[in-house]
A protein has these predicted regions:
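His/Asp/Glu-rich mid-to-C-terminal helical/loop segments that flank catalytic regions of hydrolases
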Residues: 81, 199-233
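Phosphate-handling active-site elements
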Residues: 80-94, 119-121
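Second-shell loop/turn segments in exported
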Residues: 18-22, 60-69, 98, 136-144, ...
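Soluble metallo-hydrolase cores and metallopeptidase-like ectodomains found primarily
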Residues: 1-65, 81, 85-86
Length: 233
């Protein structure tokens, strides 16, 4: 089979005009909460769970974003509730961060890396969630400098979740397309967690009817145990 690039030089130059509204006073909000670690010393180290809370909105019809990225927000909040009630107490503190402005150019994650609320060297991992509500298998993307994060996520899956898991080691970073890439580029130990499968992307049909509850539940359990293993290592 011969593969051809889908992009090519046409030799033409195009000029595009568009009407847009610019609001210099527009603001976004990152929302953070924390469960303090149980160890008197290790509680001063942090595991951050992040998921962007925004989507496209009206363009001009409603793009609900059930998978991208409400599924991740639901998983993060589910883990926050489970950890708060669990008898297994994380030794390190867990920060839950709902990041704004991902679809508007990764503005929320970029803002956090420039204005961190806890010392960067005290963050032992960022677990960034992206689209965990559609598909049949789990995926993890991690920077090659932090293979232990992938190993702990694999351990969590093997012991408690038992789903097919694809892991990808990243050796270089190009133009960031996810908050996880922003955190990696800023030097944070970060792993992107997602679910793999064909779903609607930036499409009106990315709604609640497209969500697979089974994979969303599996991703939430996977996040829970991965967080426990990292926080207590």
């Amino acid at each position: 089979t011969t593969l051809f690039r889908s992009s090519f030089h046409t030799g033409k130059r195009a000029h595009i005009k568009m009407n847009a509204t610019y609001n210099p006073n527009a603001t976004g909000k990152n929302i953070l909460g924390m469960i303090k670690g149980s160890d008197p010393i290790l509680c001063n180290e942090y595991v951050i769970i992040s998921a962007h809370l925004d989507h496209l909105g009206m363009i001009p019809f409603l793009i609900e974003g059930a998978n991208d990225n409400n599924s991740s927000s639901a998983a993060m909040l589910g883990v926050a509730e489970a950890l708060a009630k669990s008898k297994i107490k994380p030794k390190r503190s867990i920060i839950f961060m709902s990041v704004d402005g991902e679809e508007a150019g990764l503005t929320g994650s970029t803002y956090y890396t420039n204005h961190p609320l806890v010392p960067k060297d005290k963050v032992i991992a960022i677990l960034n969630l992206e689209q965990v509500g559609v598909g049949q298998m789990l995926g993890a993307n991690y920077h090659y400098k932090y293979p232990e994060l992938a190993k702990l996520s694999q351990k969590a899956n093997a012991m408690y979740v038992h789903r097919r898991l694809f892991t990808n080691e990243t050796h270089f970073l190009t133009r960031p397309r996810t908050d996880g890439a922003v955190f990696m580029k800023a030097g944070y130990p970060c792993i992107d967690l997602w679910a793999l499968g064909s779903g609607y992307y930036h499409h009106p049909k990315d709604n609640i009817r497209s969500i697979n509850p089974d994979i969303l539940r599996a991703a939430t359990e996977w996040l829970y145990w991965t967080t426990i293993f990292i926080a207590n290592k």
